[in-house]
Amino acid sequence: MQLNGRGIFVQLYTKTGDKGYTSLIGGEKVRKDANRVDAYGTMDELNSLIGYIVSQLEERDSSLKGELIEIQQNLFDCGTDLATPHGKGTYKVTKEMVQNLEMSIDGYADKAPEILSFVLPGGHPTASLLHMARTVVRRAERSIVSLSFEETVNQYVAVYMNRLSDYFFAVARAVNNRYNVKEILYERGGKVFHPELKKEDLN
């Protein structure tokens, strides 16, 4: 138990999930290992990792801190949408949120040297954590895709998560560049990035 703002004890546990079921928004009960629960559970894991990254940022990274906190807010929106069966509520994640993320990606892409091959995850401690976040995003995205083949979900949640992994990749590279940490390139692969292609060529 803990005290709320009025000095009243609030019980944190409900015991309603002791038999392996949980309730979605709207009241439907599903197993805790259902794809829907796995999807928004991974979203929670990602949000916690981002919170840790925020706590480790240096003063010079204050603008990044603000961005990451906004992403944490957006991830709660994503989790809410994933916990809402189709027709049981209004979705929160929008096309505009995806577009805002794309603008951030473009901005960070200009803050690191051009590369043609993959880079090994690592470098500055903050960049390493951002790469970790990128891989958790990918796992969350896989869960969402699995769910989308079973049930109707907000399409923009999947799109947002796809862009978010690109965001963390771009930011990790920008952080390494800012702190003058040289990236290690993957030496056994071919050209995977094509700078000659313009953004409009991909649309």
Language-model regions, residue ranges each:
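Phosphate/pyrophosphate-binding loop motifs in nucleotide- or prenyl diphosphate-using proteins
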Residues: 2-203
